[in-house]
Amino acid sequence: MGFGYGFGGGYGGGCYGGYAGGYGGGYGSTFVLLVVLFILLIIVGASFF
């Protein structure tokens, strides 16, 4: 539940949404934050290329 919320929040709301979702869930918040940052990195890379 926490992972799904952090994942959806990060993808929809951006960096702040992903951080708030992962921290609010509290279940593996660090892992969720890393996954969100990795996804954002892929999105930025895809937009450039």
UniProtKB/Swiss-Prot annotation:
Family the UniProt entry places it in: Belongs to the SscA family.
UniProt keyword terms in alphabetical order: Membrane, Sporulation, Transmembrane, Transmembrane helix
One GO BP: sporulation resulting in formation of a cellular spore
Nucleotide-binding recorded as keyword: no
Organism annotation: Bacillus subtilis (strain 168)
One of the Pfam families matching this protein, by short name: YjcZ_2
Main subcellular localisation: membrane
Entry membrane topology: Single-pass membrane protein
Gene Ontology annotations for the cellular component aspect, listed alphabetically: membrane
Matching InterPro entries: YjcZ-like
Recorded superkingdom: Bacteria
Cellular localization per UniProt: Membrane
Regions that span the bilayer: 29-49
Protein name as catalogued: Sporulation protein YjcZ
